[in-house]
């Protein structure tokens, strides 16, 4: 049981709750490719079994979200779960919002929410917040590839954003409000895409089974053909060079740097790095 599982996380559960549920269900190791806050819903990409070794490669991908923010209210957590700190009745025209969103495309610098797991001086930011300790809030650079308004009915505005990994949508909503000279908080958040994976292919927790898992051999389509003399290199996890390779079959552009090698009932995954191919993992008895 080695592959990827796409889960539609419901509101209220932590990402850890979902990982633990799946781990107990399948009795194997489970990892993830990016968490969601408890109040958020949507796509969680889970790595099952040996696929957990690919976590770092799938985490650094673009994310797409559908978010709803409420103007005229500010909370300490920057979302609807927090304590209200400020209210106003400033009305924002739709064209003002549209112009603001256009200006946000590209690289932006966003403050990290004080109620987040981001570590500063060895401690999570939310620990400082809960203890009332003042700390300098770090900023992170994010890339907004696209952002568009889906619906606006004051005080609520729903938008769709495609952004780089690690982008805090709560902070993005705060930045939108600042540029419009008002305040706002996030009231709804749903992840629609994580890299090439789409929420449309995800399963709710009630309908997960072994058949829901996308096997690694079905996910990675590019293939390397080698002679049996190279088998020892594969078993030992050694890198491969072009002279070790008999044939390269390019069947996929989504995971263009990843290749599979099938030999003696074992399945190996390699990643192309320049002129060499780096060993990533092995799955035995996969057929």
UniProtKB/Swiss-Prot annotation:
Record carries keyword Glycoprotein: no
EC number: 5.4.99.25
Highest classification ranks of the organism: Bacteria, Bacillati, Bacillota, Bacillota incertae sedis, Caldicellulosiruptorales
Top-rank EC class of the record's enzyme: isomerase
Name of this chain's protein: tRNA pseudouridine synthase B
GO molecular function (one): tRNA pseudouridine(55) synthase activity
GO biological process: mRNA pseudouridine synthesis; tRNA pseudouridine synthesis
InterPro entries: PsdUridine_synth_cat_dom_sf, PsdUridine_synth_N, tRNA_psdUridine_synth_TruB
Family in the record: Belongs to the pseudouridine synthase TruB family. Type 1 subfamily.
Gene from which this protein is expressed: truB
HAMAP family, sorted: TruB_bact
Role: Responsible for synthesis of pseudouridine from uracil-55 in the psi GC loop of transfer RNAs.
Reactions listed under catalytic activity: uridine(55) in tRNA = pseudouridine(55) in tRNA
Keywords linked to the UniProt accession: Isomerase, tRNA processing
Catalytic-site annotation from UniProt: 37 (nucleophile)
